[in-house]
């Protein structure tokens, strides 16, 4: 999803919204190696930055762009009109991209790009409830369906809230935050982002000199839980593996350590760098066909110049792989486990 350009002070740069530059754009295009006509899939359309760059890579490039957010699909209408039939916008989840492609009459793709997480448009619209910097309803749903963040905050048990904040948000004070939430909601429901942010700020003290808001990690954890973002990532990796042609490339940009760990383990296992555990014999490692060749040997990070212009890019990491002609193995249970809340005994150290 396209992240809006930012000045060093965090204010939106003067640019047309349609021309938002995605994070690591040049690096993603280089990793994809767009050297021939073909079909590219942008699994996370957002503001259309990657899609636009894919279309501009050559006159014969065709693109199918996917987004679960109906607002993003509507906003992309002008881009579709200007693409001369080379762009199709599809509302749906990128975890279903193989099914969505089949619905479009396409069995395979040459390239897939996934930009994981919340988009600039979602963060910058207060009524969507993603940002602790703007007051709005506590929603956080990317597609508008299912339980909202308010439903989780006001309805989940304290222990479950603590697990969400710790595992998905990496908030070390998750138990204290969960306890404060439960105590506050006994008095009145927590309905807005400002209410929740103020509550968290009273529990989590920022480190001296840190630019990170005390509510950052808790909001991240809730957002990931509301949208099942890690489960969607796991499904998207496997779906991309199924649709890519031999020689096709997959590029994935992540912004969270657990997201990156999932992508790293996926490429490591599928390229033969790590053994893949057998589903039928848990704990038994077995060789598996290599379905990917690594394009990036480690994570590609944004340049200092990019992070100065766009502070949101500072945690971005890019990993990419090239599809071999080997069959797609069964889904990796190890990364499916990473995408789920751990068992109680695996919660780790929290306060």
Swiss-Prot record:
UniProt KW keywords: Cytoplasm, Methyltransferase, rRNA processing, S-adenosyl-L-methionine, Transferase
EC number(s) reported in the record: 2.1.1.199
Annotated compartments: Cytoplasm
Principal location listed in the UniProt entry: cytoplasm
Region (Disordered): 298-351
Reactions the enzyme catalyzes: cytidine(1402) in 16S rRNA + S-adenosyl-L-methionine = N(4)-methylcytidine(1402) in 16S rRNA + S-adenosyl-L-homocysteine + H(+)
InterPro entries found in the cross-reference section: RsmH, SAM-dep_MeTrfase_MraW_recog, SAM-dependent_MTases_sf
GO MF term (any one): rRNA (cytosine-N4-)-methyltransferase activity
GO cellular component, one term: cytoplasm
Gene Ontology biological-process annotations: rRNA base methylation
Residues binding S-adenosyl-L-methionine, per UniProt: 48-50, 67, 94, 115, 122
Pfam family, one: Methyltransf_5
Matching PANTHER family: 12S RRNA N4-METHYLCYTIDINE METHYLTRANSFERASE (PTHR11265:SF0), S-ADENOSYL-METHYLTRANSFERASE MRAW (PTHR11265)
Family: Belongs to the methyltransferase superfamily. RsmH family.
Protein role: Specifically methylates the N4 position of cytidine in position 1402 (C1402) of 16S rRNA.
Listed name of the protein: Ribosomal RNA small subunit methyltransferase H
Organism: Methylorubrum populi (strain ATCC BAA-705 / NCIMB 13946 / BJ001)
Gene: rsmH
